[in-house]
Amino acid sequence: MDLIQQLEQEEIARLAKNIPDFAPGDTVVVNVNVVEGTRKRAQAYEGVVISRRNRGLNSNFIVRKISSGEGVERTFQLYSPLIASIEVKRRGDVRRAKLYYLRERSGKSARIKEKLPQRRVAAKQAAE
């Protein structure tokens, strides 16, 4: 590990952000700190994660939502101080790492199936 990677790892450890495990296809709520004049408040942004880029301190993800019938995408830096919290609403069942094809789709064709817990694991836990 070179010096830059080591410094990035130390910075990530120092930030100690509580980031949940999420993947493309998941519906998330990102609370962003917004400064308006002298006031600071948290603004919620809910949508589907269409991309995730894991690059250490430079990791980011793109969230897409439909606002007033128009598709809106926003890129968030994972370790940004502007992000107050990330909450996973539902898990999506997708087979791609980048869901850019959702940009051309609208309505029912843009929906993503929900990933349900595995039956075998649930049955095994119920038997115990």
Curated annotation (Swiss-Prot):
GO terms for biological process: translation. Keywords: Ribonucleoprotein, Ribosomal protein. SUPFAM superfamilies: Translation proteins SH3-like domain. It holds the Pfam family Ribosomal_L19. The keyword Ribosomal protein applies. GO terms for molecular function: structural constituent of ribosome. GO terms for cellular component: cytosolic large ribosomal subunit. Transmembrane segments: none annotated. It comes from the Bacteria. This protein is located at the 30S-50S ribosomal subunit interface and may play a role in the structure and function of the aminoacyl-tRNA binding site. HAMAP family: Ribosomal_bL19. Belongs to the bacterial ribosomal protein bL19 family. This is Large ribosomal subunit protein bL19.
